[in-house]
Structures are given as C-alpha cells and as structure tokens.
C-alpha cells in the first residue's frame, strides 16, 4: 500500500479552500448576460470556447492533491446541479464558494463547525420554501421562449426555436439537439412513430422519385420471430389480398423464400406489401413491438403467448392511416389505436422511467413515450465553424434542460433576484444557539453572491446594485444586459424554480461537508527512479568499436 500524506485542521482547510477558489473563479466568469468566455485547450484539434460552467469545471485538475480535492468537491456541486435540472451549474458553484469561504472564516474564529452546518441547512430549507412560494407556473410559449433565451446566454432565436418545438411535440415530447449542416438553426419535427429500420428490399419502393415506400391505410402485421417460410404467411396474405389494402410486415427478420414471395407479389401487383425489421434488440424489441401494437390496435404474433402466424387473422392486424418507409427509417402516421390504451401504455412506460437506474435506459424510455405520444422534434444547430458549433450546441442543450425544468416547477425572477427575496423571507429565522445563527447568516450572505457576480461580470459595482435590489421588493431587480432596473418577469428575465432550488440545495450540501472537514488524506507522490540505461555511458561490451 502506498504511503499517505495527512493534513489536519486549519492547514487542511486552507489548502482545500485554495482549490475551491481556483475552480470557482474560473467558472464564475461565465455567469450572466455579460458573462465572459473561457478558452479550453484540447490535446488535439482547435481550442474550445465556452460559456458553459460545467464544461469549464470538468477541465480543471490541479497539481497539488489537497487543493485538487477542494476543486473536485466543487466540481461535484456543478455536476449534481446539472444532473438534477440540466442548468444552474455556475450559480451552484458561486453559492458553494461563498458558503465555504464565509463558513471557514467562522470556523477559524472559533465557531462550532457542526452547528454552523445545522444553521446553513435550516436556512436552505426555509429559502427553498420561500422559492416555492415565489414560483409562477410556466405555461405559455412566450414564457418558455424567455427561459430558453436566458439559458442560451440571451440568444433569442434559440428560445423561440425551443418554444416552437415544445408546441409541436408537447411539453413532455422528445426534443433532441444535433449539429446541422448549414449556417442557420433549423427545427425538424417527425410526426407519428418513427423507428430506425428501413425496407428489407428496394423492390418494395413505390415512389421512385424519392426512393420511398408509401402505404395508404395499410394492415400492419407484427411478428416477434424470423419469417423465412412463406407457408406461415399464406392465410394472412390471401385475406389481405381480398381486402385490397396494402400490408406492412414488421418482424424480427423476413428472409429467404418469404421475402422473395412478398417481392414477387408486390411487383406483379397482386398485393401491395412492404417488410421491415422490428426496432431494437432483445427485450427492448419486444417492448417496442408492443408499443406499435398499442398505437395501431394490433396484436403481436408471438409464440411465447401461444399465437401462431398460420392462425393469424385480419383482427390481429394493426392499422394506420399512412406508413412511409425510407432506406433507413419507418414512420407510422395516425395509428388507429384507442387513446385510452395509448395513455395507459404511456403511463406504464413513465413509471418504468422513474424506476430506471441508468441514464441510457431513462433516455430510451423517454423516446418510447414521445413516439407513442405523437412525435420527436430535432433542433439542428447551425454555425460557421466547428468551434462555434460545439459552443452553440452546448448552449442549446442547456437551454432545453432549463425550459423542461421551468415547465415542471415554474419560474422565479432571474438575475439572482429570487435568491435575494428568499434570503429576505428568512430574516426572522433563528437557530438553537449563536453558532447556528451564524450559519444562517452565512447562507443568507451566500444567496447574494450570484447577483453580485452577474453585476461584476457586467463591469458594474456589485455592492451598490445589490443594496438597491435589496431595497426593492417582489420581482424588481437589475437587468445587467441593459443596465436598467425593473420587473424581472416583465423583462423576460426568468429562472426555472427547479434550477435555482437545485443549485442552492447542492451547493449547501457539499459546502457543509467541506466546512466540517478536519482531516485530509492523499497518496504521497511516487519518487521517480533514475533511468539506469540513460545514465550508463554507452552500450556495454562495445567499448572498442568505432
């Protein structure tokens, strides 16, 4: 086991505080409408320019191991806030820095660290209640666009694009962000259920001009098995031919004579058929087939539940108004499924999503919900260079997370005003002893830090403006972009309540742990052994050679 270096008390806390301040000082310059850029060097490729707090935090690794521990703990604050609400990382970092700095001053002055922490926790619980009271629901497109604009560093086009996307696919619909190919941002909405599987044979194509298969009012056969024997399908093919409607076959695979027969039937015009592979793999494929069955009012033909393909009838088929199949995708538009059944299926998937432990599973379940509920919106980010593209994409993703959080828990006045009002709301709060009262003061003082930092980044005097804002009440605050005072909500400067709440809770939680730290342990750096081969004066045994 490697030898360890141990530091105690004040010596440990000072080292940790240095690390906290290095990371927080790098992150906090990005806060507010006039936040500055941070340039990140990459081991390959061009440097990345960003205003995203969590991107800056992730890059920082300090040489001194004790200082690095402090920096990594603040990085955890930014990460936790980002995971919970998708934004508010810089605010959380500024809050944590303020609580740690003020808290450690109090510890150095002889206060009991545990009572300080209890006081801070009390203040945060009170402030969170106050934020909930101040919160206003975020229901209309205008408010959603304003939240998106603020989070995308005052880029109005991004806010409007996100509001449009939410209008089209619903507030809980799936909205993804991709790198576009042009200079302009674009919104692409896929209506209906789309999955990444194309036609199994180009001979199914019936729209030669764009190379797609289009089926109007088709029957949809869903089979959880490989189909290679055409005899299994003959009864259903005959029934479909009599109905003179087209048929879409979605199965694990269609191969051999079964595929050949479907192609021949299509080419001769006997029955209009197309076949695609079922989406997903394993259990996810079974679940997605069941989703399609719910959407189209069909039944999945599966031997696991005793259904055989030979005995399938038209009653087992799903139906939709239209199906469009390209080389890579299949889109089912307007399935005839019962709305109550679809809602029930969506509720069931949402329940699974809440219980899922991995982000990947949650994302896939959310996609399934959106496909059932009516569509997916893709925001394609446009930019002139790759560096700008990466920076912009990160901002758009932040803005998207913010708007989701706003829809979930409502909005409060932005620009650090809500935290100032929350701090005022807990003025009368008292702890069990004087040390707890100091903890409450530390937390209340920290709640001013985001406003002060926004003002400092705008090149103004923080103390003057903070005092002016504190003298007002309600949503009155300072707009750093226009350098004017006014009603923040009316000016469209909003923060999602969830983002502000998460930032405060995570900052206080981790800062509280740092204040109560008494000992730090790290590995001693390993001594590098001298390179023996380099120090020997030449190659052994070859002294006489020239």
Swiss-Prot record:
Q: Name one GO biological process term.
A: protein refolding
Name the PROSITE patterns for this protein: CHAPERONINS_CPN60
Q: Where is the stretch described as Disordered?
A: 527-546
Q: Which CDD domains match?
A: GroEL
Q: Which residues bind ATP?
A: 30-33, 51, 87-91, 415, 479-481, 495
MF GO annotations = ATP binding; ATP-dependent protein folding chaperone; isomerase activity; unfolded protein binding
Q: What does this protein do?
A: Together with its co-chaperonin GroES, plays an essential role in assisting protein folding. The GroEL-GroES system forms a nano-cage that allows encapsulation of the non-native substrate proteins and provides a physical environment optimized to promote and accelerate protein folding.
Name used for this protein in its record: Chaperonin GroEL
Q: Which organism is it from?
A: Baumannia cicadellinicola subsp. Homalodisca coagulata
